[in-house]
Design a protein with these regions (language model features):
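Formylglycine-dependent sulfatase
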Residues: 1-408, 413-414, 423-448, 458-465
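Short arginine-rich
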Residues: 451-455
């Protein structure tokens, strides 16, 4: 593009797709995001390439599936030297790039996450809102400067107050970055920790959401039996009924965290208006993966591919160039966000790139209901046994317009859902002989896709022999 805009890229952590009022949830409070939906395009069927933080982020930061970039686990020692992350490519193209919050392409356990060639001039790190890092944790330093003690506040009845919250800190740093930018176009990658567990919003927000008024999770009693068959597949928490999980209470606290995110996100947009930069700034709102929140008797995340866990919000707004108030139900992968950002910043897509730009839909040049024939997600030994008690699971999801196939490799189990008739995935058709034809067809399609899309054939061929 000859007209290169600024890019505000706001990424939450573990936020489900169905948590925005304007997209059909009457129980949340998201006026800022509702306005963003009306001012742009919401891709309502966007899927992450792993239901776990690091492999998902590795994928959309590189434009490759996690297994292709060889970064499939949380807690990994290092990030590969190749491929370059997209922010490095964008910085090399002349953008002033900033990062606030969590990056999580490598382990931040017992250490500050090491920097890579990431392209960021402005770097304000905070992996999580805990005081667990001796150095390099900008948020903890910010809290201490204001007389706060993070660990004590987190354990108090009122939790961390809004004025000292990580989400507030992130907005303060974003406002600082936006106000100090010069003549170069800029990209700000802002990554807040919420609504990631533990679900501990400030009391002032928690009090706004009554658990008794929550709709509760998507759960049927048959889910308990279905999950028993998958008991050998990694997950962070035990299968329980909604009552045992206090699912409505968790939902209320989760929505409270999102309400706070919405308010702080609005402060950043107000700064864009005040500085006269709104018209030339593309705004993107998304998340790295979802949250089970009691669906199917599950809480948190792990080796499953249910809609609440792998489907995420993705909203683009740039009223100057993009269509307004458009909702696209096309199948989208998070790598497509990466391709779109490269195209917006004038960076040619590398020949290895697996993302597909969304600009034709955003600008009305292509059908908003068509983008990909299928989307994929992977879980390859992604969580440490410390979190799951398991021994490492390998699984893949292949989702078409009508069906979802999940194969738990080496376990002898799988899932097949007819999404047109069972959108919340309560009836597993894997063992139903009536559906054996479509199951076998999808297994073949998924195998082909895995071989063709994730096989690394090695170095470049330079001669016939």
């Amino acid at each position: 593009m000859t007209d290169r805009p600024n890019i505000l890229w706001y990424c939450t952590d573990q936020q489900r797709f169905d948590t925005i009022g304007a997209l059909g949830n009457p129980h949340v409070r998201t006026p800022g995001l509702d306005d963003l939906v009306r001012s742009g395009t919401a891709f309502t069927h966007t899927y992450c390439q792993s239901p776990i933080c690091t492999p998902s982020r590795a994928s959309f930061m590189s434009g490759l599936y996690p297994s292709r970039v060889h970064n499939t686990r949380n807690g990994n020692e290092s990030f590969p030297e190749w491929p370059p992350v997209i922010t490095k490519l964008i910085a090399d193209a002349g953008y002033d790039c900033g990062m606030i919050g969590k990056f999580h392409l490598q382990s931040a356990g017992k250490r500050t996450e090491p920097r890579i060639e990431d392209g960021f001039r402005y770097w304000k790190f905070s992996h999580a809102p805990r005081d667990d890092w001796k150095e390099g944790h900008d948020y903890a330093d910010w809290v201490r400067e204001r007389g706060g003690d993070l660990n004590r506040l987190r354990e108090s009845e009122d939790r961390v107050p809004t004025e000292l919250h990580q989400t507030t800190w992130a907005s303060e740093r974003a406002i600082e970055f936006i106000r100090q930018t010069g003549k170069k176009p800029w990209l700000l990658n802002l990554n807040v920790y919420d609504p990631h567990p533990p679900f501990i919003p400030p009391k002032s927000y928690a009090d706004q959401f009554d658990p008794s008024e929550m709709p509760g999770p998507h759960f049927e009693k048959s889910d308990l039996e279905a999950q028993a068959k998958l008991a050998d597949c990694d997950f962070q928490d035990e299968v329980r009924s909604p009552e045992e999980h206090d699912a409505k209470g968790a939902q209320a606290r989760y929505y409270a965290m999102i309400a706070q995110i919405d308010d702080q996100f609005g402060r950043i947009l107000q700064t864009l208006d005040e500085t006269g930069q709104r018209d030339n700034t593309v705004i993107v709102f998304t998340s790295d993966h979802g949250e089970s929140l009691g669906d199917h008797g599950l809480m948190y995340k792990g080796c499953r591919f249910y809609e609440g866990l792998v489907r995420v919000p993705l909203i683009f707004s740039w009223p100057r160039r993009f269509l307004k108030n458009q909702q696209s139900d096309a199948l989208v992968e998070m790598m497509d966000l990466s391709a779109t950002l490269l195209e917006l910043s004038g960076v040619p897509l590398p020949d290895y790139f697996q993302g597909k730009s969304l600009l034709p839909i955003l600008t009305g040049q292509s059908d908003a209901s068509e983008h990909r024939n299928f989307v994929r997600s992977e879980y390859f030994d992604a969580l440490d046994p410390h979190f799951t008690g398991g021994s490492g699971t390998y699984a893949t999801m292949h989702r078409t317009q009508t069906h979802k196939l999940c194969v738990y490799h080496g376990k002898g189990v799988g899932e097949l859902f007819d999404l047109a008739n069972d959108p919340w995935e309560h009836r597993n058709l894997w063992d139903d002989p009536i559906h054996s034809k479509i199951k076998n067809q999808l297994i073949a399609e998924s195998f082909d896709a895995h071989v063709l899309l994730t096989t690394d054939v090695g170095s470049k061929r330079i001669a016939p022999m």
